[in-house]
């Protein structure tokens, strides 16, 4: 069930959902606007010949901080990681989804590539996967609205929420844009085996 503005306010007032800092003026009919922080993680294309999700590639990205009062320039075709200014904390029976802002989408800015879902139990800054699909550079001003969080109540509390010992929870408590940690639990299936259990041709 998607939470309305009054439901979101009730969850915030009860301390079950938390945004830090929280500005009541960011509340929308069924979401809360979030702002972009001043930190960005750029990809260094000269350190590795390829990107491999199975490998630890610590020098694949580098962290930069936008100077006070200056925007970060996202060039056409460029992909960078950013993060929400707000730290988001969810209980075990509420999940969230990050959606982009329509006005920014109409300028060619994509707020997230795939990872818009936020598990119940998560606490941290939400990493943004920012892409410029326009033909001109886009200025990203730290503190500007970058997206909106929608909240969903689960049919029952998660038995093993994000952050519990049952899961790796690689991004719990993350601060700022956090590079991929896919190598920590990388798995792949032998796809040469058919449904009948015989090796494929």
Swiss-Prot record:
The protein's superkingdom reads Bacteria
Detail which positions bind dCTP: 101-106, 119, 127-129, 148, 162, 174
- A Pfam short name: DCD
The pathway where this protein functions is:
Pyrimidine metabolism; dUMP biosynthesis; dUMP from dCTP: step 1/1
The active site annotation covers: 129
Q: Where is this site: Important for bifunctional activity?
A: 116-117
Q: Name one GO molecular function term.
A: nucleotide binding
Q: Which GO terms describe its biological process?
A: dUMP biosynthetic process; dUTP biosynthetic process; nucleobase-containing small molecule interconversion
Q: Which CDD domains match?
A: trimeric_dUTPase
**Entry EC number(s):** 3.5.4.30
Instruction: List the catalysed reactions.
Output: dCTP + 2 H2O = dUMP + NH4(+) + diphosphate
Which UniProt key words apply to this protein? Hydrolase, Nucleotide metabolism, Nucleotide-binding
Family in the record: Belongs to the dCTP deaminase family.
Oligomer status and interactors? Homotrimer.
Give a short account of what the protein does: Bifunctional enzyme that catalyzes both the deamination of dCTP to dUTP and the hydrolysis of dUTP to dUMP without releasing the toxic dUTP intermediate.
Protein's recorded name? dCTP deaminase, dUMP-forming
Which organism does this sequence originate in? Clavibacter sepedonicus
């Amino acid at each position: 069930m998607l939470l309305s503005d009054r439901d979101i306010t009730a969850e915030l007032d009860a301390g079950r959902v938390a945004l830090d800092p929280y500005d009541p003026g960011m509340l929308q009919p069924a979401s809360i606007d979030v702002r972009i922080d001043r930190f960005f993680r750029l990809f260094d294309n000269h350190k590795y010949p390829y990107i491999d999700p199975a490998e630890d590639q610590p020098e694949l990205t580098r962290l930069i901080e936008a100077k006070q009062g200056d925007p970060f320039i996202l060039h056409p075709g460029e992909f960078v990681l950013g993060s929400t200014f707000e730290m988001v904390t969810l209980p075990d029976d509420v999940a969230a989804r990050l959606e982009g802002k329509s006005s920014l989408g109409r300028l060619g800015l994509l707020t997230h590539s795939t990872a818009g879902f936020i598990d119940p139990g998560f606490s941290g800054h939400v990493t943004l996967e920012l892409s410029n699909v326009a033909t001109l550079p886009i200025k990203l001003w730290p503190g500007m609205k970058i997206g909106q969080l929608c909240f969903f109540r689960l049919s029952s509390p998660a038995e093993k929420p994000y952050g519990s010992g049952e899961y790796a929870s690689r991004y719990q408590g993350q601060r700022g844009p956090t590079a991929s940690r896919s190598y920590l639990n990388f798995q792949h299936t032998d796809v040469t085996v058919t449904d009948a259990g015989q090796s494929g041709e």
